Amino acid sequence: MVFNMNLKEQAMSLFYESGFPKDFFSFLWITASILILVSGVVIGVLVIVWLERKISAGIQQRIGPEYAGPLGIIQALADGTKLLLKEDIIPSRGDALLFSIGPAIVVIPVLLSYLVIPFGHNIILADLNIGVFFWIAVSSIAPLGLFMAGYGSNNKYSFLGGLRAVAQAISYEIPLALCVLSISLLSNSLSTVDIVEIQSKFGFWGWNVWRQPIGFIAFLIASLAECERLPFDLPEAEEELVAGYQTEYSGIKFGLFYVASYLNLLVSSLFVTVLYLGGWNLSIPFLPNFPYLEWKFTAETSEVINVIIGIIITLAKAYSFLFISIVTRWTLPRVRMDQLLNLGWKFLLPIALGNLLLTASFQLIA
């Protein structure tokens, strides 16, 4: 993790003086970074689940969770613990191997997507030169896990849910990739850090949401479809397919699908923040942008304070998008399968392609 290089150098020198080998320090640093990221992601998912239950309760004029902890804040943790203790049942006539590895193939690509997300200045696990396309590439693996789960269940509802998941992913990943490519053309980079820094040069009005309004709307719709959220939750439509590819699952494997869904929703929200909303930069309209504030502390303390502020700003923007996603789920009806595919192939794909050509033309003229 790229984080406060002075702190890393001090820790490295301390380890060398203590007689530890260099490889041991690198292993310890990477392990600590991954554990911190995973812990933060898990806490973020628990917060999302609690927010969704409370917001949906408010929309439906209910109270929502209130007994497990203050305001029901640990209700999701209690539900997860209950799933851990439930029996793991494997269908007798299903494919046990596909049935077992399907949930893992769904969760792992989503976790890998967090590697290239900058949560703040110098807060990123892997600053790759192809960061955004790394996300597109690994996210395309998850539908394969859904199809394996549906096929391995030996259940017609599960199989149909897996087929729907693959069709939906293929339909909406292409417009999503075209929108990302338009942002990359504007920024002349595929690195997520470079994209944020390019936006920070021009303050609030330099955000890509103003420079790419058509692409932003297309990205918003495509990301909701990729997350399989209402009105695009066709692979697990309860009224049609019982529970889709999840029908035969129980216990922790059943819970992994829900974890992957909320992890994917958080990933999409963070990428909306990074690609369109200026990332960790706090930009106020009609005022100049100050990416780094000066504090009356030591240089290390000032850098840590700025890093914390950047993380808070990034999460605030991401959770604002999450609020829109949650409200959309509880206010719009589900579309039909043919409407879903028509929206992806006949509307979003031409719009995203036209937006890319328009962006490329302006870049050539400029």
From Swiss-Prot:
GO terms for cellular component: chloroplast thylakoid membrane. The chain crosses the membrane at residues 29-49, 97-117, 130-150, 166-186, 202-222, 254-274, 307-327, 340-360. It is a multi-pass membrane protein. It is found in: Plastid, Chloroplast thylakoid membrane. Its main location: plastid. Pfam families: NADHdh. Its EC number is 7.1.1.-. NDH shuttles electrons from NAD(P)H:plastoquinone, via FMN and iron-sulfur (Fe-S) centers, to quinones in the photosynthetic chain and possibly in a chloroplast respiratory chain. The immediate electron acceptor for the enzyme in this species is believed to be plastoquinone. Couples the redox reaction to proton translocation, and thus conserves the redox energy in a proton gradient. NDH is composed of at least 16 different subunits, 5 of which are encoded in the nucleus. This is NAD(P)H-quinone oxidoreductase subunit 1, chloroplastic.
